[in-house]
Amino acid sequence: MAEVSEEIRNLAARHQEFQRQAEALRQEMSMVQASIASCDQAIATINELKAASEAGRAAETMVPVGFGSYVYAEVKNPDKVVVNLGAGFSAEETAEAAVETLNRRKEQLTKILEQMNASLTKIAQGMQALETEAAKIQPGQA
């Protein structure tokens, strides 16, 4: 009986570790999803500003000035965009090149998210296997 109890405790500890891994992975996935949404928003904004300019309308936007405050501003040159390249570096690109850069980054993030989903599935399968094993050890307790 002590063997069974020890084995159940071992399975429970492994299950809890899987749960911790799954939660950490879900949090990371949430950050990646937020980055994908940010790419989508940047692409849409660049395209809208460029379309407004091409149609002869003022390309207006709101610029953050700090502490949740914004000012309205007119974009003088929506054909030029400064894009974050990573590691603290940025570069000025044409609107088209900026959209391409953002689309590439979005594709990379989407692949990462798919890999994370696959990892989460493996963790869930591992948890299920532990639950099945525990049910075999204690059929009346499952």
From Swiss-Prot:
Keywords: Chaperone, Cytoplasm
UniProt keyword annotation of Ubl conjugation present: no
UniProt key word Lipoprotein: no
Subcellular compartments: Cytoplasm
Signal peptide as annotated in the record: none
GO annotation (BP), single: protein folding
Assembly: Heterohexamer of two alpha and four beta subunits.
NCBIfam families for the chain: prefoldin subunit alpha
Protein name, as recorded: Prefoldin subunit alpha
Organism: Methanosarcina mazei (strain ATCC BAA-159 / DSM 3647 / Goe1 / Go1 / JCM 11833 / OCM 88) (Methanosarcina frisia)
